[in-house]
């Protein structure tokens, strides 16, 4: 395969294959070969490719996943004879670090929570690092203390810091009394104004957290080094080591750096885990700027030509999916297909139950209530139509919850139809594949006896088509049991949105001075990152930032459109037209609220504005007018 990639006239690959694949005897990164030798690069579904490129250069991993992965190899190591363990000290040290990891995670989590509780968590509500925390208190402590902490952060000078031995005790045990005592004594000498001052407790707790985070950063790096030194391959290769080892060195030679610099940070998850993430580069440049990533001596671009293909990449305002490139050609669907789509029935069920936005601990219960309310409509659809039905949720676990509830409801009503839940390709536990289908095999759903598929929005929006032997969609109806939106505080998604925001700004940027442009990028990216952090704390009903709100609405539209596209694979326009049900009550604002986030109304306004735009409306009308015609006819709008 590697030889063919170098000699073939046509190479078909994935995003990861293009960026990270290696070819030839020298194992050269395939991206280098493509930039140097390819005449043209076609990107299919370029809006999704754009998102995947940004995602690829923002690796993230949960520390507890590393701990879970360590369980078996560490157990095997402990079952060895002492002679065998002594025979490979490098592997023994790696095992020591692995075994110590649960204690370190508990200590870091406790330090984060202690700092959060002392100041209502404003700085710690989102992503943070030792640097950002120190910056937040720099005006409240002496310059000498700031310099001492910076000395501790620097790997070259850390051991010369008077805080080094104290830091070494920070994650020694979950009983942190000794560490806290030593640090308190140090602070009493250096920062007497903090002593016995109730108003300064938050500052002391932040310093304690900063010292703990510095230790944690060193500990994570030490794990990577220990793995490299270990010669025992049975100790395993895991996600954390992959996270540490990933440098994208060759790729960064071509790409602009991350917009805020090579960002590194951590985040405390809802399960008290620590999420680590980095952003290495501006990934979408490989999509929109590939011809300019290789130039001759005169500065003329000589990189590959690029053809971008997608039916949903023109969605202004969506920082994930809108591709900031001029549209040169539109392949318009046949009139009969446009009419078929325009005759779709859109219906909202008007349920009071609100799945999206409900407390996590109650969400499954609310989802089951929605399934109960929808069961009669589902049975009616099965009776009235020959096609199959898609039920859309937000996760694989929700898919199982819905499938189980619907099966139980069918039994009560004497309905013999079968229900199939989509599961991850990584899931190895499910055995009864009459009730489950893997994501990578979803195209086979047409061959299954089951007429109902329950699937997460992000798992079903793209990829394999579910069609009959004639290529016509097997699906005739879709029920949105949830409001399809991303996770508000997902750091990878936030990085993608930041890239998209700046791409939209730079598309219209006219300043030629490179220094001023770079300064503008850093400043605007940082401001927008902070805006996202601030908006993430607010409920949608109270979201005031118009650009972030428009991004949410436009991105939701693209997701709904792509899922709807599963029903619009049309080869026979005489067949039954699709029906789309909005079941989640959260698609509308609360009944008793004068103001609030009304997703269906917001989406109507967004589409109407885009289609009526004087300059680019023709593009939007060609792509989306059939959808809008059907939507406008079935959904109430104000």
Regions found by a protein language model. Give the residues of each.
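Conserved helicase/translocase P-loop NTPase motor core
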Residues: 2-37, 49-53, 237-300, 453-456
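Signature of the SF2 helicase/ATPase Hel1-core->accessory helical subdomain module
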Residues: 2-7, 13-223, 278-279, 301, ...
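Conserved strand-helix element at the start of the C-terminal RecA-like helicase core
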Residues: 381-407
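Long insertion/accessory domains within large nucleic-acid-processing enzymes
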Residues: 446-447, 457-459, 500-503, 538-551
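N-terminal targeting/trafficking signals and adjacent low-complexity tails
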Residues: 504-544, 554, 582-638
């Amino acid at each position: 395969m590697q030889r063919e990639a170098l000699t073939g006239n046509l190479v078909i690959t994935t995003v990861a294959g293009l960026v990270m694949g290696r070819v030839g005897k020298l194992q050269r990164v395939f991206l280098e070969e493509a930039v140097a030798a390819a005449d043209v690069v076609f990107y299919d579904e370029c809006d999704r490719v754009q998102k995947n490129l940004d995602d690829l250069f923002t690796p993230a991993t949960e520390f507890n996943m590393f701990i879970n992965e360590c369980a078996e190899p560490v157990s095997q190591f402990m079952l060895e004879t002492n002679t065998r363990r002594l025979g490979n000290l490098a592997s023994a040290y790696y095992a020591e670090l692995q075994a110590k990891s649960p204690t370190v995670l508990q200590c870091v989590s406790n330090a984060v929570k202690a700092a959060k509780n002392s100041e209502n968590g404003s700085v710690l509500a989102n992503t943070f690092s030792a640097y950002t925390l120190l910056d937040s208190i720099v005006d409240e402590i002496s310059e000498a203390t700031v310099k001492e902490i910076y000395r501790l952060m620097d790997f070259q000078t850390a051991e010369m810091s008077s805080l080094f031995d104290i830091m070494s005790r920070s994650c020694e045990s979950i009983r942190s009394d000794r560490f806290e005592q030593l640090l308190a004594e140090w602070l009493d000498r250096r920062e007497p104004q903090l002593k016995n001052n109730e108003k300064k407790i938050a500052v002391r707790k932040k310093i304690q957290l900063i010292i703990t985070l510095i230790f944690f950063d060193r500990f994570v790096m030490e794990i990577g080094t220990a793995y490299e030194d270990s010669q025992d391959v049975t100790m395993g290769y895991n996600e954390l080591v992959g996270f540490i080892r990933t440098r994208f060195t060759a790729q960064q030679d071509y790409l602009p750096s991350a917009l805020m610099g090579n960002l590194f940070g951590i985040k405390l998850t809802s399960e008290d885990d620590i999420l680590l993430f980095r952003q290495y580069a501006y990934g979408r440049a490989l999509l929109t700027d590939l011809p300019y990533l290789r130039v001759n001596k005169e500065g003329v671009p000589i990189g590959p030509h690029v053809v971008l293909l997608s039916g949903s990449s023109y969605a202004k305002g969506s920082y994930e999916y809108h591709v900031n490139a001029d549209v040169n050609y539109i392949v318009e669907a046949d009139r009969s297909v446009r009419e078929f789509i325009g005759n779709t029935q859109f219906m909202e069920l008007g349920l009071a139950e609100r799945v999206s936005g409900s407390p996590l601990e109650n969400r499954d219960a609310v989802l089951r209530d929605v399934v109960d309310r929808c069961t009669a409509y589902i049975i009616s659809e099965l009776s009235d139509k020959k096609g199959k039905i898609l039920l859309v949720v937000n996760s694989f676990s929700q898919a199982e919850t819905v499938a189980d509830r619907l099966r139980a409801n069918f039994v009560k009503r004497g309905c013999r139809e079968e229900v199939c839940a989509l599961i991850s390709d990584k899931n190895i536990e499910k055995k009864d594949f009459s009730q489950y289908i893997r994501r990578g095999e979803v195209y086979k759903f047409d061959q299954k006896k089951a007429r109902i598929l329950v699937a997460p929005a992000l798992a079903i929006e793209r990829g394999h088509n579910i069609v009959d032997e004639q290529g016509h969609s097997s699906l005739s109806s879709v029920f949105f049991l949830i409001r399809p939106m991303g996770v508000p505080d997902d750091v990878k998604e936030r990085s993608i949105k930041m890239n998209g925001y700046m791409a939209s700004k730079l598309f219209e940027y006219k300043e030629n001075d490179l220094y001023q442009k770079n300064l503008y990028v850093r400043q605007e990216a940082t401001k927008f990152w902070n805006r996202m952090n601030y908006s993430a704390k607010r409920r949608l009903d109270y979201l005031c930032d118009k650009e972030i709100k428009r991004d949410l609405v436009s991105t939701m539209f693209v997701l709904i459109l792509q899922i709807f596209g599963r029903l619009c694979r049309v080869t026979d326009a005489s067949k039954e037209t699709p029906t789309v049900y909005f079941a989640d009550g959260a698609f509308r604002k609360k009944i008793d609220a004068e103001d609030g986030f009304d997703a269906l109304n917001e989406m109507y306004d967004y589409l109407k504005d885009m289609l009526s735009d004087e300059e680019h409306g023709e593009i939007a009308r060609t792509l989306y007018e059939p959808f809008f015609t059907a939507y406008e006819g079935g959904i109430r709008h104000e």
